A protein has these predicted regions:
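Flexible, membrane-associating and regulatory peripheral segments of lipid-active enzymes
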Residues: 3-4, 13-107
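Serine-dependent carboxylesterase/thioesterase catalytic core
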Residues: 92, 137-244
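Second-shell loop/turn segments in exported
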Residues: 93-97, 128-136, 229-230, 294-300
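Alpha/beta-hydrolase active-site loop signature
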Residues: 95, 123-125, 195
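C-terminal catalytic-base region of ester-bond hydrolases, centering on the histidine
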Residues: 210, 250-331
């Protein structure tokens, strides 16, 4: 799955409130160090190319059994973009990695002539396909360095980002707004992004606003120690989310934003939380074009209708009509 169960988040939060000692040190809330994922030195999947998968669950199982698997066509640092194209960086979701998220996208985009890259950072060593569980700020710094490496290798001035879940929401938006990414990103194409939080709004508000600030800090510290800070950060009323999205526009001039979301998303609830309601953002509801698309959050990067929309967003001057294909609900 791309996002933690909200039940897991709530249970962890209240276990923290009852179990954490009253003298827990404030230093526990410090940003944890970046963790290099197994099989992905410097963030680059290096365990060989994996087969193309058509659904997220087979891809995730394969990624777990083969840490550091590279999606076909990705991370070729000798690739030079065609004229008019930027290198494309694919950002995975929480609890996922480059292969599990992008085993379908990477080879398809490569066949279209794009230079495609996708990194693994900041996850759980014991579950080697669970990347991006750690503090989003740390992940964003790692992504910043990865983008710089891509720009240097390709001789490009900017990249286009395609991201799913966290990888389309708080991760790239933190990089763009806080780490100078607005000078290096041409397009952000966000697939089912967790922009305004995951899970039901009422539960998110209860966890983050119905407890004292001291207890809130203990919760943050516990998640950080377990290297799952991004779980708490993606609650809509987390301090991180409020800092990133609650202080004026999150979009930046010069970056073209596209958000693609489906109404059957069971992680970003309501699905409208994915959208950025700011000037210049193109928010796309999949069912406005493909009414028989029932894909949920976890299978969103294996939805062929969404893929066509993403390709159109990459190259809007040559956009093609979407050929809709029935997509079952896979939650």
């Amino acid at each position: 799955a791309a996002l933690p169960s909200l039940t897991t988040i709530v249970a962890t939060a209240f276990a923290t409130i009852s179990a954490a000692p009253a003298h827990a040190a404030d230093s526990d809330t410090s940003v944890p160090p970046e963790i290099t994922m197994p099989g992905s030195p410097d963030g680059i999947p290096s365990a060989g190319n994996g087969p193309i998968k058509l659904f997220t669950y087979p891809a995730s199982v394969y990624a777990l059994a083969h840490p550091g698997t590279n999606p076909q066509g990705a991370n070729n640092f000798s690739c030079k973009p065609r004229e008019g194209q930027n290198p494309v960086v694919l950002l995975p979701g929480t609890n996922s990695d480059a292969y599990a998220s992008w085993s379908m996208y990477a080879p398809k985009l490569t066949k279209l002539g794009y230079c495609v890259f996708s990194p693994n950072f900041n996850g759980l060593k014991l579950l080697p396909n669970f990347a991006y569980t750690g503090d989003i700020r740390v992940s964003a710094k790692a992504v910043s360095g990865f983008v710089d490496r891509v720009l240097t290798a390709t001789g490009s001035k900017k990249v286009d980002l395609i991201g799913w879940s966290q990888g389309g929401g708080p991760l790239p938006n933190y990089y763009i707004t806080k780490l100078g990414g607005d000078k290096k990103v041409s397009k952000l194409i966000a697939l089912a992004p967790s922009n305004h939080g995951v899970g039901p709004r009422a539960v998110s508000r209860f966890v983050n606003e119905s407890i004292s600030e001291a207890k809130h800090k203990k919760i943050e510290a516990t998640f950080a120690k377990a290297h799952i800070a991004s779980y708490e950060q993606q609650l809509g009323f987390s301090n991180f989310n409020k800092e990133l999205y609650g202080n004026g526009p999150v979009t930046r001039p010069g970056v073209m934003y596209t958000v693609i979301e489906g109404r059957y998303d069971v992680a970003v609830v309501p699905f409208t939380y994915a959208f950025l309601n700011e000037p210049g953002v193109k928010n796309i509801l999949v069912q406005d074009t493909c009414r028989n698309d029932h894909a949920s959050h976890v299978n969103f990067t294996y939805d062929v209708n969404v893929y066509q929309m993403a390709v159109n967003a990459l190259d809007p001057d040559h956009a093609q009509p979407v050929t809709c294909v029935f997509q079952p609900f896979i939650g």
